[in-house]
């Protein structure tokens, strides 16, 4: 028993010692975290994520959370008897579905995250991209390969412009912003936007130190299924050309590349199924995912 206690103490001491240089390095820096996947549905992972965010704030960082909520939207639609339809992984969003999206993302999911942060001693404010004109959106025009036929996805949008005024106001007040990826267009309509795209755009607008994307994978894997721990844009271009990066991971990689090519120091694609994944990635030498930087 004494040996076990000694080993545990040594492990804790090692982690704390290892984290100190990173705490100093990133004090006062802005880190945008896209929160999604298993980390949003597993109770233990939800709690560990909230604690990670609170600790980052306590040691002087400025974490900003952008969240998804696809499974929760699907569950609510099913309850009201409405079928979910997807094209190339994107939810077809008519006006009725958009009402549900706003209710679930802007209400249920957003406020649950805010409440979890509060439970662990943090101070956060939840908002959507419609608040303070944070996210100006435009309708997404999606074409299907190989015909290039333009498909109307309804209220599915992309980021047109980010106004960081409301975020800066919250950071100045020492709050943790928790943002639902809903924007408003010049036409006055609400649009549901992919949370990875929103997180990347906000990170770029703020010149953030880091963009962290939580996934249901270990990170970016090579052709043999081995984790690629560190990549730059040149290597990634090659991996896309040879087909190593494909399908569902490709849009996420494009978000990561867009960020590091436009002022964000680094992007991290990490395994949200690992407890305290955010802290392990930011505060340890080995991390728990793939670090992406720009070679320019």
Swiss-Prot record:
Gene3D superfamilies: Acetylglutamate kinase-like. It is an enzyme of class 2 (transferase). GO terms for biological process: arginine biosynthetic process via ornithine; L-arginine biosynthetic process. Its main location: cytoplasm. Substrate binds at residues 69-70, 91, 192. GO terms for molecular function: acetylglutamate kinase activity; ATP binding. Pathway: Amino-acid biosynthesis; L-arginine biosynthesis; N(2)-acetyl-L-ornithine from L-glutamate: step 2/4. The record marks 34, 252 as: Transition state stabilizer. Pfam families: AA_kinase (PF00696). InterPro entries: AceGlu_kinase-like_sf, AcgluKinase_fam, ArgB, Asp/Glu/Uridylate_kinase, Glu/AcGlu_kinase, NAGK-C. Catalyzes the ATP-dependent phosphorylation of N-acetyl-L-glutamate. This is Acetylglutamate kinase. The lineage of its organism: Bacteria, Pseudomonadati, Pseudomonadota, Gammaproteobacteria, Candidatus Pseudothioglobaceae. The gene is argB.
């Amino acid at each position: 028993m004494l040996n076990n206690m000694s080993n545990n103490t040594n492990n804790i001491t090692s982690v704390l010692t290892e984290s100190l240089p990173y705490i100093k390095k990133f004090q006062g820096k802005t880190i945008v975290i896209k929160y999604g996947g298993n980390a949003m549905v597993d109770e233990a992972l939800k709690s560990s994520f909230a604690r990670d965010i609170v600790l980052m704030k306590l040691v002087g960082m400025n974490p900003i959370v952008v969240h998804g909520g696809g499974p929760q939207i699907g569950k609510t639609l099913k309850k009201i008897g409405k079928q979910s339809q997807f094209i190339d992984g994107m939810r077809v969003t008519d006006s009725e579905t958009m009402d549900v999206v706003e209710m679930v993302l802007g209400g249920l999911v957003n406020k649950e995250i805010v409440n979890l942060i509060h439970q662990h001693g943090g101070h956060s404010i939840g908002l959507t991209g419609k608040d303070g004109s944070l996210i100006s959106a435009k309708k997404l025009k999606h074409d299907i390969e190989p015909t290039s036929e333009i498909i109307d996805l309804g209220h599915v949008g992309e980021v047109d412009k980010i106004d960081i005024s409301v975020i800066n106001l919250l950071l100045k007040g020492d709050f943790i912003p928790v943002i639902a990826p809903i924007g408003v267009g010049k036409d006055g309509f609400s649009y549901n936007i992919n949370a990875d795209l929103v997180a990347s755009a906000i990170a770029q607008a703020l010149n953030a130190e880091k963009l962290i994307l939580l996934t249901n994978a270990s990170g970016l894997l090579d052709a043999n299924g081995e984790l690629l721990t560190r990549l730059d844009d040149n290597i990634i271009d090659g991996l896309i050309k040879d087909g190593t990066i494909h399908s569902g991971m490709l849009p996420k990689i494009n978000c990561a590349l867009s960020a590091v090519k436009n002022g964000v120091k680094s992007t991290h694609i990490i395994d949200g199924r690992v407890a305290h994944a955010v802290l392990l990635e930011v505060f340890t030498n080995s991390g728990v995912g793939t670090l992406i930087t720009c070679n320019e």
